[in-house]
A protein has these predicted regions:
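FAD-binding core/adjacent interface of flavoenzyme oxidoreductases
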Residues: 1-5, 64-135
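Beta1-alpha1 glycine-rich phosphate/pyrophosphate-binding loop at the start
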Residues: 2-72
Length: 135
């Protein structure tokens, strides 16, 4: 049985997990994310802020979907890949083994380098937690 490790739970990570499950129904698939909310639509955050959608609609892939596809979700930050050992080191010192690993961490906004950007109340919005600071 193959062990698949996907770092990141954005669209690329979720799509990869779905594709792997189709190709290898018995494989073990683990997704690692530091995003406490799991997978949600980051583009949808703008619509959440404007009130066009409720928070529940940010989740196109539910916890039931994770269970249905037998995906293990680990809430941690991957800090190092050890290719020779086929392991990923987590921020807490834990390790996860793999046969195949995919890095699908996506993009992050770069804070603006404008006068006043360092003040409290100026928030870059990459995550649901940051959107909540604005709401």
């Amino acid at each position: 049985m193959s062990e698949y490790l996907i770092i990141g739970t954005g669209p690329a990570g979720i799509s990869a997990a779905e594709a792997i499950r189709k190709l290898d129904p018995g494989g073990r698939i683990t997704l690692v994310t530091e995003e406490k909310e799991g997978y949600y639509s980051r583009p949808g955050l703008a619509y959440l802020l404007t009130g066009e959608i409720p928070q529940e609609q940010l989740y196109p892939f539910s916890r039931d979907d994770f269970q249905r596809l037998q995906l293990k979700l680990v809430f941690a930050r991957a800090v190092q890949i050890l290719p020779a050992q086929h392991q990923v080191v987590l921020h807490d010192g834990g390790r996860i083994g793999y046969d195949r690993v995919l890095i699908a961490t996506g993009a992050q906004a770069i804070p603006a380098m404008l006068p006043g950007a360092q003040y409290s109340g100026v928030i870059k919005m990459d995550t649901l937690a940051e959107a909540r600071q604005i709401i």
